[in-house]
Amino acid sequence: MFSRTDSISKRILLPLVLFLLLAGLAPAALAQTKTFHWTQWDIDVVLQPDGRLAVTETQTLDFSGAPFTFGYRSIPVGRAGNNDGISNVSVREGDQIFTESSSNAPGTFEVVDQGDETRINWYFDPALGERTYTFSYIIDGAVCVGTS
């Protein structure tokens, strides 16, 4: 038969063992937390004679934790962006030019109209550490052109 101290010991021991087991797994779970930050973000804007803006963004991101396989860039358009939208989108990583496709395959990107913003989703091989991506696009109707 069990004594009263055996029963109390089991009630304390089981939760203690579960707590220690979960506490031991926590560092592994934290190590897999996906985070990123920009280490550099350069933007080159050239005003075209027709009032459009030719934009080139070069973004260096530092991925940590579990590998990343996609990213996105949202650009306000219409009234929210005070423009007529974007066009001529291209994405590259170094010399690799991404292909426009909705396949979500590495090396592709898609342009998605979401009303007040246009979202550029781009897909790449699993990435950790620093990676640099270049986005080029035209902002239509950014500047009103007229004669005086």
Describe each model-derived feature in a short phrase.
Residues S9-K10, L22, G71:
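Residue-level detector of alpha-helical hydrophobic segments embedded in or interacting with membranes
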Residues P27-S148:
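Lumenal/extracellular ectodomains and adaptor appendage modules
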Residues P15-G24:
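Bacterial N-terminal signal peptides
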Residues S7, L13-L14, P76:
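Sequence-pattern detector for short linear motifs
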Residues M1-S9:
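N-terminal secretory signal peptides that target proteins for export/translocation
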